[in-house]
Amino acid sequence: MAEPELVNGGVKENKLWKGVFAVSGIMSTLVIYGVLQEKIMRVPYGVNKEFFKHSLFLVFCNRLTTSAVSAGALLASKKVLDPVAPVYKYCLISVTNILTTTCQYEALKYVSFPVQTLAKCAKMIPVMVWGTLIMQKKYKGFDYLVAFLVTLGCSVFILFPAGDDVSPYNKGRENTVWGVSLMAGYLGFDGFTSTFQDKLFKGYNMEIHNQIFYTTLCSCVLSFTGLILQGHLLPAVDFVSLHRDCLLDIALLSTVATASQFFISYTIRTFGALTFAAIMTTRQLASIMLSCIWFSHPLSWEQCIGSVIVFGSLYAKNLLNNKKNSQTQPPPPELPQYEKVESS
């Protein structure tokens, strides 16, 4: 009897270390990503205090890095690079993903990172709308209640900013109406992207690296074309060649963005979407706190209440979902089956 207990203990310890790896990977990469994107878009470079204005160039660099790494992962695992789904479906995800990321970067010119991060929590509503339209999903009353509370908390956070914002990076740049409009575009496009990705995974038997590779490859082509058509490619290259610290920031941003993609995929595959949602909620809270400290963003008491409403609702939803999931799940499989799942 001692041997099975020893085996089960080893499995639990292995799962624990995988959890530590997943949490530390997601938290570190995405928190660094958040700080870097705010620095690039809101902090001036050089003695002349010039701002980096070419958000599409950031999208291109991020997607180029991710597509190269995902191609390397496919080749290293000796898997074919042939597309599993029709190419136009990858392109559709790419277009909405580019629009999502561009709105995200552009919004940082007009609203602070804490406002943007908390507003991202309101993506539940567009996801529910797109899920109903595209996948004919049905949601319960509790889901709508959580979505309403999160939206309410986000609205309070945006509408009641601190009156004595001492951040030197906000002066003359705040425009709540335009910033909120860009965030609304971000939420709409992001909701469609995630819902259509879900539909693509369920409709085709594809590896995560396959979807990442073709989606980011299409994004590279589209963003590069957009830079040329807008005439922003050479100005962006001139800016980063003149300001080497900006080039370093963009390189690091692309690196952590790529790393976060694979940590996210690993976490969802190993622990499921519910655990991933709880980790992401914690990451958003940590990002807001770090941004407030790093870039001197004060929070009003109304914003603190809004934050409590948002994160309290999200944690309550995750807790209830985990409880419901544990009650409906069958007993854990024996060790040979567990090893088979982990190696797939």
From Swiss-Prot:
User: What keywords sit in the KW lines?
Assistant: Antiport, Membrane, Sugar transport, Transmembrane, Transmembrane helix, Transport
Positions of region (Disordered): 324-344
GO MF, one example = antiporter activity
Q: Does the keyword Membrane apply?
A: yes
Record membrane topology:
Multi-pass membrane protein
Function, in words: Sugar transporter involved in the transport of nucleotide-sugars from cytoplasm into the Golgi and/or the endoplasmic reticulum.
State the family named in the UniProt similarity comment for this chain: Belongs to the nucleotide-sugar transporter family. UDP-galactose:UMP antiporter (TC 2.A.7.11) subfamily.
- Its recorded name reads UDP-galactose/UDP-glucose transporter 5B
Q: What is the protein's species of origin? A: Arabidopsis thaliana (Mouse-ear cress)
